[in-house]
């Protein structure tokens, strides 16, 4: 090929999604087992009547729905539509946030291991990823603070953390945000927040209101079950939202995805009630794995993390032989999605047999 490409791209790997194998149980991509509600299906079908038209590039109706939804849960006037940005999944908003803050020579801090897209997007922007090792499978916030330099522009906090399933203590997160210099953007990536239970639920939107440099990311892919439609949103200071609009790819969230998201907001209580079923299965699977002899951190997500180290690849290979597709992370461990009960049973049967082998 004679085209002159950016040479630095040669050293950047492509993002690797969870595999799909026909006939196998896929527990690799943290998808919900539930399909869309009838009301959401109806909204999707109705939206197909206008496929000859461009989608609303300003996401006006969706942003108004989101603002009203936040008002309902947080109190009147919590956020305005001008404080909400919509993207083609929260992953696209991650990229936009990097674009508006960081360029060559700048630094972006995040825990590691964490969401695999962070280092790829940072390097693509020409910036430098600063990976801070996890402590006990969760964010080491003190070490992340110590990693801040005069070149730091952005910090990602993936909470709950993907792939290790853990959550940051809310009080510790508040202290961390207060300690970060106000010119550095702190992005709290909450793709799995709906699965957090007990006193670990963060007041992330309160942090946005108290600190103009804090951004919260949410997605419709997980608890809302719209992974195939790719739509997410950010809640932030209005100036940040305006900047995000300057690096946004026009029309990237379709009319269908917007209609489905609006209908999902209207049915939020019913959809979020489904997470209780996932949490119950998560607790059952966790207890069974520990009883079988596995060591794993407490999960606050819709998946569990098995830190298998050098045994990771053998576990993945043998799982595939048993028609189970799980997600490996090098020689660190395996992420396993909480699925339907019968699928979880199949996985547990395999896991018990595997750990019992010499």
From Swiss-Prot:
Presence of the UniProt keyword Transferase in the record: yes
Entry EC no(s): 2.6.1.57
Keyword flag Glycosyltransferase: no
Cofactor needs: pyridoxal 5'-phosphate
Reaction equations catalysed: an aromatic L-alpha-amino acid + 2-oxoglutarate = an aromatic oxo-acid + L-glutamate
Enzyme class: transferase
Pfam families: Aminotran_1_2
Protein task: Aminotransferase that catalyzes the conversion of aromatic amino acids and 2-oxoglutarate into corresponding aromatic oxo acids and L-glutamate.
Assembly and oligomerization: Homodimer.
Family the entry assigns: Belongs to the class-II pyridoxal-phosphate-dependent aminotransferase family.
PANTHER family membership: HISTIDINOL-PHOSPHATE AMINOTRANSFERASE (PTHR43643:SF3), HISTIDINOL-PHOSPHATE AMINOTRANSFERASE 2 (PTHR43643)
Name of the protein this chain belongs to: Aromatic amino acid aminotransferase
Organism: Mycobacterium sp. (strain KMS)
